[in-house]
Amino acid sequence: MAINLITEYQKKIAERFTLGSLTDEAAGHDYDFTGVKTIEIFSIDTVATVDYTRSGTTRYGNVTELGDTKQSLTLAVDKGFTFSIDAGNASEQFNIKQANRCLKREWDEVCTPEIDAYRLKSWANGKGLSSGKAVLSNTDASLTKANIVDAIFNGSAAMSDKKVPRKNRYLFIPELTFVKFKLADVVMAHQMNKEAVQNGFKGTIDGMKVVTVPSSIWPTLTGGGTINFMIKYKGATVDPMKLKNLRVQKNPMGIDGDVVEGRYIYDSFVKDSACDGIYISTGSTSGGSSVGA
């Protein structure tokens, strides 16, 4: 890694662009992994209704023990990073490498996009789903300005047909694909939210918050195939950030300067009981079981 010592260069740092987290608002944070690596989520069964009988000892029907299903989720992602800022180098670079700022820069530029990419891929591919479970999907081939509006509204309708709540839905769509929506002959401009754009949100479509995603972190199907867009209900997933330790050590043994360290443990899973809360539009028929277990 190069160390560029200062001659007569400017003290101002040329910062790179960052977006902040694109997925955190839509992530599910309802379950606590504190102190454990694996949790088990129970879903309680229901029973069918019967016609009431006005005589006999089974007037309400035959009694059966109420069942349940269990989904085990185990954290698998354990990441870390470290770098040093030597005191001698720092003194010859106008002290432009401030440890705390460099730590924040590392988190914003490297860690946050990595977490976003992992979550998007996990959601789209139904990570953690039990056998026989899958997210909703439809093959729309290549989207154009002529068919993209229909495809998005059909996806929203498919989720509504499965009784997925309309509140807390998010439409994740690549930046360049969203251009096709804006250029569509029938653009629902009056439905677009006029509030200031924050963290990638571009208003709402059919009640869904729009989040445009750079191509660099947009997911593909695990088994091969492209994804046009994804609709997600917030409560459909479990997205723990169990550990996030970021620190600066001043002059640790053997080093004259600062040592920056970071470690974070996280993962992302789709709940069996809420797998209909994710819908993907695919651009190919390959992949099949890649959208579920």
Show which residues each predicted segment covers.
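Structured, hydrophobic secondary-structure cores that serve as assembly/anchoring elements
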Residues: 46, 71-97, 152-183
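Short Gly/aromatic-enriched secondary-structure transition segments
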Residues: 54-61
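A glycine-rich, hydrophobic loop/mini-helix early in the fold
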Residues: 66-87, 110-114, 122-127
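Alpha-helical scaffold segments that mediate packing/assembly in large oligomeric complexes
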Residues: 90-161, 279-293
